[in-house]
Amino acid sequence: MLTVTVAQDGSGDFASIAEAVLAVPYEEEALVQVGPGIYREKLVCEKRCITLRGAGADKTKLVWGDGGKLPHKDGRPTHTFRSYTAFFSGETLCVEDMTIENDAGPGAKAGQAVAAYVDSTRAVFRRVKLLGSQDTLFCAPLPEKEREKDGFLGPRGLAPRKPTAQYYTDCEIAGDIDFIFGGGDALFENCVIRTVDNHISHSYVTAPSGRADGLGFVFWNCDFVSDCPPGSVYLGRPWRPEGKTAVLDCRLGAHIAPEGFIAWNDRTDTGLASFAEADSTGPGAAERPAWVKQLSGPEAAELLAHARTLCRPKAN
């Protein structure tokens, strides 16, 4: 395995993360060891098999500030999918012990502001903080069709849609509107899901858009926390009619609305979307609408086992 080091003080092979990633040949398995510091960079990482390892989420920080409403260098608005701080693609990705942040600010000012755009076929995030406001984490792929002109403008807007399997463990993910969204299959274990109070009427944690036969987003043993007013945050709304989110054995703060989930305006057929829950605890646990499925113990165990098989990294 190729190992390269990044240090802002000049003691490493490179002084920036982008330079280090660019130096890695696509086909070579590589570890990029990133030292402490705030790296103000917009990163594109497209490698076959790469690990980015920081010195700790509070020590190694990758930060950028593009927002969907802000102007792009081509004269058009940046839009959602060019706003990323980090874009990841390739076959196998692992990110550990660092923060990836989009600090463009709240959506009212900056628009959608993606911290991590994850398009790798298989991706693992361990002990990572993903911080932002609107649209913090995009779990690719995109839906098949955009609803607005230039809505999918970005690195994969015209590419064939390919499934991805993503695994997040011991991470913190923060934002306010649809801050975990997309069509990927993703399992979140032992994570803190933090809704930021940007003084808006309602917030939404997930906005899935996956396939009818896909897994969607599964959360297990996570803490949903916030300083938002009680009952003002929904666990999810379907970005596309067949979106799926399941919340299993999680602790829900008082900010979670009693309904739990909500339709996406009048565009949602709740008969197609799949929202499910099992054994939620805390002030945000409540009786849900009939279209939110309450899983039995065996059903929840089966779903979790399937999610782990699909999304957890394979043993060598």
Regions found by a protein language model. Name each.
Residues 2-316:
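Sequence-level preference for short, compositionally simple segments enriched
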